[in-house]
Amino acid sequence: MTRAVCPGSFDPVTNGHLDIVRRAAAIFDELVVATGTNVSKSRLFDPEERLEMLREVCADLPNVTVMGFTGLIVDFCRDIDAQAIVKGLRGGNDYEYELPMAQMNAHLTGVETVFLTTHASWGYVSSSLVKEVASLGGDVSALVPPAVHGRLQARLAAG
């Protein structure tokens, strides 16, 4: 059985993330969607909220499990016996950022990184952009799953 990990901050999960998850789930026997802590990013949702949203939007995917992790993603992969890391690429900047990490991960443990290009309709979507546009009153309902949109609106309304 081939197990892969699709890591991210998912703050919040977008339809672009979900597209990558669905496509990766069709490729691998088992996919673990893992949300971790990235100290360089400020968070709107805490880890448990992000896990809840991911579980809700991935509920229809029988071979997908949602888990949290701390530390290095390659250590998490080793702990759960995952053979690959799946990362979505929106464009060249993502590749420039992800390539050295993929090379380091392979150096540390031999875990391979599989890059999936984002569908053109989601290429401009990022969690950061969704949060910024939503905080300024813009309509992001087409960019996030409905359950996530409700939570996002409630969180921003609460201040």
Swiss-Prot record:
Q: How does it assemble?
A: Homohexamer.
Q: Please, one GO biological process term?
A: coenzyme A biosynthetic process
Q: Does the keyword Endoplasmic reticulum apply?
A: no
Q: Which Pfam families match?
A: CTP_transf_like
Binding of substrate occurs at S9, K41, I73, K87
- Describe the task this protein carries out: Reversibly transfers an adenylyl group from ATP to 4'-phosphopantetheine, yielding dephospho-CoA (dPCoA) and pyrophosphate.
Where does this protein reside within or beyond the cell? Cytoplasm
Q: Where is this site: Transition state stabilizer?
A: H17
Supply one GO CC term from the record.
cytoplasm
Q: Which cofactor does it need?
A: Mg(2+)
> What is this enzyme's EC?
2.7.7.3
Which GO molecular function annotations are given, in alphabetical order? ATP binding; pantetheine-phosphate adenylyltransferase activity
Q: Family, per the entry?
A: Belongs to the bacterial CoaD family.
Which amino acid positions bind ATP, per UniProt?
S9, F10, H17, G88, L89, R90, E98, W122, G123, Y124, V125, S126, S127, S128
- SUPFAM superfamilies noted in UniProt: Nucleotidylyl transferase
- UniProt lists the gene as coaD
Top-rank EC class of the record's enzyme: transferase
Q: What is this protein called?
A: Phosphopantetheine adenylyltransferase
Its recorded reaction(s) are: (R)-4'-phosphopantetheine + ATP + H(+) = 3'-dephospho-CoA + diphosphate
**Protein's UniProt keywords contain Chloroplast:** no
Which lineage ranks, top first, belong to the organism behind this chain? Bacteria, Bacillati, Actinomycetota, Actinomycetes, Propionibacteriales
Annotated organism of origin:
Nocardioides sp. (strain ATCC BAA-499 / JS614)
First and last residue of the signal peptide = none
Q: In which pathway does it act?
A: Cofactor biosynthesis; coenzyme A biosynthesis; CoA from (R)-pantothenate: step 4/5
